[in-house]
Amino acid sequence: MESLQNHFLIAMPSLDDTFFERSVIYLCEHDDKGAMGIVINKPLGIEVSSLLEQMDLPAEQVFADIAQNAQVLMGGPVSQDRGFVLHTSQPYWANSTDLGSGLMLTTSRDVLTAIGGKRSPDKFLVALGYAGWGKHQLEQELAENSWLTIPATNALLFDVKHEDRWPQASRSLGFDAWQVSAQAGHA
């Protein structure tokens, strides 16, 4: 099995799941035990600055402006009460996992305090919940043509507007995902 860690999953138009419809998921982990990822294009309608306020983590003014423009994302249907911060590597927070390619996933409160202050990661996404797959489940969904995959890029992850991530990710494959058949074939 080839790991798809540090890849994007792009939902096929035929994916019959209202939660994952037109989703782009960054895969944080993928091994023979399963997979874990964060949906990167489904904003919840909450600014990061509001989340910081709700957690009694006041943001300094300059950094409050950055946090106000950032949206909290619906990271997936699993553990929606848990926060996940996907960010560029800076090694001084608790509960951080190095994902490679200059990215980290942090689940501790201290990274949110940093986002409100002077130690904020250069680029970050804040999500509630994650997407998870059991052993061989993702491989089965890939075989069923539910997802397309591409290597992850920081540009798509951090610089493209949420609503543009799915069409841009599908176009990066060289075609429009709407033109792909939902049926798998064998020659």
Swiss-Prot record:
Pfam families: DUF179 (PF02622). One of its GO terms (cellular component) is cytosol. HAMAP family: UPF0301. Belongs to the UPF0301 (AlgH) family. This is UPF0301 protein Sputw3181_1330. It comes from Shewanella sp. (strain W3-18-1).
